[in-house]
Amino acid sequence: ITHTCHGAGGCVGSTGMQRILVLNPKGGSGKTTIATNLASYFASRGDRPLLTDNDPQGSSTRWLKKRKPEQAFIHGIAAFERNSRMTRAWQMRIPTDAAHVVVDTPAAVLAQEMPEITRSADAIIVPVLPSDIDIHAFSKCIADLLLIAKVRRDENRIGVVANRVKRNTVIYQSLMRFLETLRIPVVATLRDSQNYVRAAELGCGLHEMKKYQVEQDLADWEPMLAWLRAKELKEPPQSIDVLPETA
């Protein structure tokens, strides 16, 4: 099986590949944390996922560089970089053994870019923090996905993650009431935990840490992972696109 790229537009891969987009145009919503932990999960179960870092901050790429040789292998593409020694198509090629592609998107993705970004995504994970500012930005993101990218609710491609929550707070209750009105599944509610900080420092994910240390956090992740596993049973789109070129 081969995966060939067509310029900057995208790549064609096997039908067995699952593409997961982690998206929220607002910075600081936890996209990289979710993307790296997803890649870690797939790697820990014996897959060889591809983590594509489209964020100029390069946080996912730095995380990958911290990983030790004995850790489960994760392919990485620093998509935000421009390498003058190779073509863009060669730089963006998708490894033939990558069953999962996790895309860490940058902040400030424009509404008009959403149709191209989301077209071939099997799952679009949208994290949101429990704050008024974040909820407002998240609302616009969801509206853009539904109205501009034309992602239909009945496709069940969008999954919301309530991130860094403290369940006994008023703002958390407000967030959950708001999410209930959207008719879009909340696939995970992740607590505000120092385990994510430790994992980032070590270049690993929760699923690679000692279970007794992260048991509660692993339980938080299980609904989202079950949602993604259910999608693996369905045939994903053939086209695997990268983010559009930026000036």
Regions from the language model: what does each represent?
Residues 198-217, 222:
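Inter-lobe coupling/hinge region of RecA-like P-loop helicase motors
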